[in-house]
């Protein structure tokens, strides 16, 4: 069996999430997800909130917070980086909190600085250069980010600068080679990150909704890498 032929929807998993958590809960439907400790700290400082539970990991618990904004109950948590970890945590966060709509944003590398400079980036499709998505959907080069147009509508409504394009999701941050970058650019990719294709695959599988966008950080457009805004927070 080829390594990419890992999608098995003919038999059931041996590990069920109910083995790890006593009860399934519902607190709110919409959950905001950030990858930034700085954003988490700002959230805790500026919004009245309470922890409604956590996802357990060997690195320590990931707290899930409930808060209200404009009389609507919302959830928030800080996700680990990478498609494999972030997708597993999302599934467990759903079980702990009841969330099915996930607003996920974070930084990305820029493959086309002319198109992306000073703009938010809305992925239309994600190149599946990671492992987890192949366990949740049939093999393909790209997965469609199905709520792309909804993000576009919101950004247009509030006159936010943005660009729409394909994104490259990778597990191998230190193997973003010149040839790979050029190939992804030829296919229409404007950004590179580490989560979106995996998150979209798991959302498709479980019937969740993903709303994702990025802000530019480092630049991989050309022969040399530029740190640019890497490490900057939004």
Regions found by a protein language model. Give the residues of each.
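Hydrophobic/aromatic beta-strand patches that form the interior of the parallel beta-sheet core
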Residues: 77, 103, 121, 163-165, ...
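Glycine/charged-rich beta-loop-alpha catalytic/anionic-binding loops adjacent to active sites
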Residues: 67-76, 180-186, 228
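Metabolite-binding pocket within alpha/beta catalytic cores that recognizes anionic/polar moieties
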Residues: 1-145, 149, 205
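Short acidic/His/Gly/Ser-rich catalytic and metal-binding motifs that mark active-site loops
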Residues: 129-132, 175-177, 219-224
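Active-site rim beta-loop-alpha module in soluble metabolic enzymes
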Residues: 141-187
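A C-terminal functional module that forms or caps the active site or interfaces directly
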Residues: 179-211, 215-219
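Glycine-rich beta-alpha junction loops
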Residues: 36, 109, 168-173, 198, ...
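His/Asp/Glu-rich mid-to-C-terminal helical/loop segments that flank catalytic regions of hydrolases
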Residues: 220-234
